[in-house]
Amino acid sequence: MADEQQQVFQLQRIYLKDTSFECPGAPEVFLQEWKPKVNVQLNNSARRVGEGDEFEVEITVTVTAKDEAEEKTFYLVEVKQAGIFTVKGIDGEERAQLLGAYCPNLLFPYVREVVSDLVAKGSFPQMVLQPINFDALYQQQRDQQQGNAAAAGETVQ
């Protein structure tokens, strides 16, 4: 019993890793009717930091707003928000779930705030990113990996 490793999950730090706001058509875009087509792309990743039990989890969101004909770009926003988490005594699927779903859920409100602030400072109407179910995205990715492995005759752990 004494040999069992205690499970530890701690948020160490949340930080803005990179951000960019572009308004390539300014000032002419401000004279156009505001009927944007908005495209939101999302990516998240996790990696071990150093030799210890710390992991960096990063969310990258790219938001592009174009006119209806998609000829002119109103704005392009890219935000990379990250956090450092201590994950000790938690392995395998449980750790993968923490890093692939739980941690991104913690970071996403910060991404939403940065995107909203940048768009407002660019003099555009408020952009509020809708909530994202990272648990469902994680499970979908996991199912896809298992399906690909099964097709190749391998097993996924």
From Swiss-Prot:
<keyword id="KW-0653">Protein transport</keyword>
<dbReference type="GO" id="GO:0051082">
    <property type="term" value="F:unfolded protein binding"/>
</dbReference>
<dbReference type="GO" id="GO:0015031">
    <property type="term" value="P:protein transport"/>
</dbReference>
<comment type="subunit">
    <text>Homotetramer, a dimer of dimers. One homotetramer interacts with 1 SecA dimer.</text>
</comment>
<comment type="function">
    <text>One of the proteins required for the normal export of preproteins out of the cell cytoplasm. It is a molecular chaperone that binds to a subset of precursor proteins, maintaining them in a translocation-competent state. It also specifically binds to its receptor SecA.</text>
</comment>
<dbReference type="GO" id="GO:0005737">
    <property type="term" value="C:cytoplasm"/>
</dbReference>
<keyword id="KW-0143">Chaperone</keyword>
<keyword id="KW-0813">Transport</keyword>
<protein>
    <recommendedName>
        <fullName>Protein-export protein SecB</fullName>
    </recommendedName>
</protein>
<keyword id="KW-0963">Cytoplasm</keyword>
<dbReference type="InterPro" id="IPR035958">
    <property type="entry name" value="SecB-like_sf"/>
</dbReference>
<dbReference type="Pfam" id="PF02556">
    <property type="entry name" value="SecB"/>
</dbReference>
<keyword id="KW-0811">Translocation</keyword>
<dbReference type="InterPro" id="IPR003708">
    <property type="entry name" value="SecB"/>
</dbReference>
<dbReference type="GO" id="GO:0051262">
    <property type="term" value="P:protein tetramerization"/>
</dbReference>
<comment type="similarity">
    <text>Belongs to the SecB family.</text>
</comment>
<dbReference type="GO" id="GO:0006457">
    <property type="term" value="P:protein folding"/>
</dbReference>
